[in-house]
Amino acid sequence: KDCKRESNTFPGICITKPPCRKACIREKFTDGHCSKILRRCLCTKPC
């Protein structure tokens, strides 16, 4: 199961995955993606 949390460091609107993923990895998560509706950067890691 993956735990999901909004990135604390990603600025602005999330349009492409790579910069979001990079921010998430810096925050000790394993991956990150953009939310479809609100365009937020969401970080994921195994719980």
Swiss-Prot record:
Site (Required for formation of double helix): I15, I37
Disulfide bonds: C3-C47, C14-C34, C20-C41, C24-C43
A GO molecular-function annotation: phosphatidic acid binding
Keywords assigned by UniProt, alphabetized: Cytolysis, Disulfide bond, Lipid-binding, Plant defense, Vacuole
A Pfam family annotated for this UniProt entry: Gamma-thionin
Binding positions for a 1,2-diacyl-sn-glycero-3-phosphate 1 per the UniProt entry: K36, R39
Family: Belongs to the DEFL family.
Function: Plant defense peptide. Disrupts membranes containing phosphatidic acid (PA) via a PA-dependent oligomerization process.
Protein name per Swiss-Prot or TrEMBL: Defensin NsD7
Species this chain originates from: Nicotiana suaveolens (Australian tobacco)
